[in-house]
Amino acid sequence: MNPGNRDIIDLSMNEGEPPSRACLDVLERHGPALLRKYADPAPLEAAYAAYLGTAPANVLATTGADDAIDRVFRAFLAPGEEMVFPTPTFEMVPACARMSRGDLVPIEYEWGTLPHDDILDAVSERTGVVAVLTPDNPTGRAFSTDSLLRLAAALPPEVTLMADLAYAEFADEDPTRALLEVPRAIMIRTMSKSWGLAGLRVGFAVGAKERIDALRGYGGPYALTGPSIAIALDRLENGVDEMRGFVEYVRSRRERLAAVLREVGGVPEPSQTNFVLASFPDARWIQRGMAAQGVLVRYFAHLPEYVRITVPRDDAEFRRVERALGCLDRPEALLFDMDGVLADVRRSYREAIVRTCASFGVEAGHDLIDAVKAAGQANDDWAVTHGVLADAGVEASLEQVTARFEEVYQGTGDEPGLRRHETLIPSREVLAELARIFKLGVVTGRPRADAERFLREQRVRGLFSAVICREDAPLKPDPAPVRVALDRLEARTAWMLGDTPDDVRAAVGAGVVPVGVVPPGGGRTGWTALEEAGAARIVEADTDFGGLFHG
């Protein structure tokens, strides 16, 4: 889903605030020699050890935390041995264990309390590693240092305890120093989150010298680049206060984000990280609806009731998040495509395409028309008809095709046109109720005369404060007509209901929430096309229309 050219806020990856530009000065100081030489990680390991309050021999610099996790399993999880871990967890933990050909033993538990007894019950002579995240991803919960020490003390000496502490700076407790006293423990740290250096891929394994020495043999000798080491080292020497200021900002804003989520029907989990996990009745709607508005959040297929949202990094981002969530809960306006959403055009516009093609000797079935519409760039039925004829080898101008189409649709002389078969899909009562709550608008590719006539004939014209037609702006999928509708309605947030990928793409480009509508008689093909185009939700016009706004 691509929200046009608007700025996208990515709150799906838990990345930190970008560091100050001053950190780039180090590259200028080093010059091109930094790129020529193989990089020595020892100064970085010493600086990070000093930051943690331990010896350099207890620290191994790795290519991000993922590399550290991978090394732990390659070193301490033999093929066929078991990795015991509370679940859900960071996906790279089980992924790396599988790559080492280890067997997974997941432990379901009540989030927030370390399942000490369940973990110990699962440990056997085949156990190689017990893996724990604190604070946890994706739940955001943290385990107490005491509970970790109690678990470590109870594990057999040959079992390695891996504690992923990627979010430790954001938590109330940092168990690093306590776990450094546990010979079998290895901690995973990173500069991707609180330090804002995810692009450098700088991580660390921290533990007893004997364990760290073992890990050194399970990776390349130059795991980090010279620029990565130089910038990370500079941040450790000059950026600690900056990092801690950002951490305090996140801690102060977590509850604000949780409050916003509660206001729109979410149930947020307590968090000690830089993100909040929240459950919703329809989490997929939240994720896709926010993406359409240019705010990316994380949805988990294995946790289908939840979305995870990184704490916005400044007030401007917070306002975008609040507006996007508010729109999903209660938009200012509802924008309707006409054909297939308000008007049942199976026996009018769609049939006009069929009969116009037939008049040129070409058979065009409804399945073909559905496929053309689903492919996109098909909001102009005159152009669609001309394209079908051209594909069949008919040499006719667009003007000729349009004239024939209009004869069929409008009627000629004593021959009534197909437009007489058009009916209103939603009831007038439903539209009237919506008009009492929202500003309503129509965004259609129809000529104004046809659109206005249909609305008058169906006695609903007075319910729509804006009717945008082909004369007003470029046709969808261009977002321009949607933006014109927003301007005329004086609305900042809206849902756009449409039955084609062009409607969805126009909505996304304009920053409004696209709701796909499967028109009467539509099948699975239309549903799939709407979903692939980025519809945040899909409903069937003749069954779900009213319920969409009352669920």
Please report, for each region that a protein language model flagged, where it lies by residue.
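N-terminal helical cap/lid subdomain that shapes the substrate entry/recognition surface
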Residues: 332-338, 342-429
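N-terminal small-domain helix-loop-helix segment of the aminotransferase-like
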Residues: 1-67, 71
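PLP-dependent aminotransferase class I/II
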Residues: 20, 184-262, 266-268
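Acidic, Mg2+-coordinating phosphoryl-transfer loop and its flanking beta/alpha structural elements
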Residues: 496-539
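Short, acidic loop-to-helix structural element flanking the phosphoryl-transfer center
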Residues: 411-442, 448-452, 479
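Conserved PLP-binding catalytic core of the aspartate aminotransferase-like
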Residues: 250-251, 258-293, 311
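Active-site phosphate-binding strand-loop segment of PLP-dependent enzymes
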Residues: 111-171
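PLP-dependent aminotransferase-like
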Residues: 75-132
